[in-house]
Amino acid sequence: MLPRLGGPALPLLLPSLLLLLLLGAGGCGPGVRAEVLFRCPPCTPERLAACGPPPDAPCAELVREPGCGCCSVCARQEGEACGVYIPRCAQTLRCYPNPGSELPLKALVTGAGTCEKRRVGATPQQVADSEDDHSEGGLVENHVDGTMNMLGGSSAGRKPPKSGMKELAVFREKVNEQHRQMGKGAKHLSLEEPKKLRPPPARTPCQQELDQVLERISTMRLPDDRGPLEHLYSLHIPNCDKHGLYNLKQCKMSLNGQRGECWCVNPNTGKPIQGAPTIRGDPECHLFYNEQQENDGAHAQRVQ
């Protein structure tokens, strides 16, 4: 689904599959910049009351928390670290991966980006977009650039579509990319037998489930002006590894600034591992999977 992020579990799917929707996305290069606007739930009086006092340290600018948080935090200034899960850059800045980074998306996810002035090539419409970001409206835009190009994003000069359609298009492309990555193995034919076509390998259960999700996304419509996010949150996108098996850890999408719940599954069947917790964090699935394997082995020996 995604370019390689590092580690066998990350090449295809991040725990927050709606990464580009939850943090926004931009082109990484002069003249290319596309951003995703998405609608956050309104900040209720109860949520605002739970925020407590504003930061004690003097801030050049206050911004909302990452994601759809309602509380105020100090904006990151030029040269400071930035990323998906840490405070936003100030209004005139963008969060970029460091030049030459081999894993730019991973850098943004892990907070290893840097707040910089907007790079050359932004159009007047894009400047207007950045001004709207700090208004009191219901739209929130996180400026974290460097991911859209890797997912085949829009090119410079293309008229941006409506925000809801843009969200859905990015999401579809993200799942399509996972689909293509998992099918790469079947496309590399032997150089010695260029005319001999090999039958495609059988789809694994995880790949089949992904196919079904992709089909549902392709038929989604926008019935109103609320945008597609509420519909996307109801989907579970399977986290498949490069071999098409389920990754041990599966996670729901992040919502309202909170990490989604994660649980452990059998890599072959995708069924939950008994005894493993469901938590907002790392359930350390390898421990429960190893224990299950040992129990299954002991049971097999008793049967023999």
UniProtKB/Swiss-Prot annotation:
The keyword Disulfide bond applies. GO terms for biological process: cellular response to hormone stimulus; female pregnancy; osteoblast differentiation; positive regulation of activated T cell proliferation; positive regulation of growth; regulation of insulin-like growth factor receptor signaling pathway; response to estradiol; response to estrogen. One of its GO terms (cellular component) is extracellular region. Disulfide bonds join C40-C68, C43-C70, C51-C71, C59-C74, C82-C95, C89-C115, C206-C240, C251-C262, C264-C285. Cleaved by MMP9 leading to release of free IGF2 from IGFBP2-IGF2 complex, which contributes to enhance the motility and the growth of astrocytes. In adults, expressed in brain, testes, ovaries, and kidney. Expression in the adult liver is barely detectable. SUPFAM superfamilies: Growth factor receptor domain, Thyroglobulin type-1 domain. GO terms for molecular function: insulin-like growth factor binding; insulin-like growth factor I binding; insulin-like growth factor II binding; protein phosphatase inhibitor activity; receptor ligand inhibitor activity; signaling receptor inhibitor activity. Residues 36-118 form the IGFBP N-terminal domain. The keyword Ubl conjugation does not apply. Residues 1-34 form the signal peptide. It is found in: Secreted. Residues 203-285 form the Thyroglobulin type-1 domain. Keywords: Developmental protein, Disulfide bond, Glycoprotein, Growth factor binding, Growth regulation, Secreted, Signal. Its main location: secreted. A motif (Cell attachment site) lies at residues 280-282. Interacts with IGF1. Interacts with IGF2. Interacts (via RGD motif) with integrin alpha5/ITGA5; this interaction induces cell migration, adhesion or apoptosis according to the context. Interacts with PTPRB; this interaction leads to PTPRB dimerization and inactivation. The C-terminus is required for IGF-binding and growth inhibition. Multifunctional protein that plays a critical role in regulating the availability of IGFs such as IGF1 and IGF2 to their receptors and thereby regulates IGF-mediated cellular processes including proliferation, differentiation, and apoptosis in a cell-type specific manner. Functions coordinately with receptor protein tyrosine phosphatase beta/PTPRB and the IGF1 receptor to regulate IGF1-mediated signaling by stimulating the phosphorylation of PTEN leading to its inactivation and AKT1 activation. PANTHER family: INSULIN-LIKE GROWTH FACTOR BINDING PROTEIN, INSULIN-LIKE GROWTH FACTOR-BINDING PROTEIN 2. This is Insulin-like growth factor-binding protein 2. It comes from Rattus norvegicus (Rat). The lineage of its organism: Eukaryota, Metazoa, Chordata, Craniata, Vertebrata.
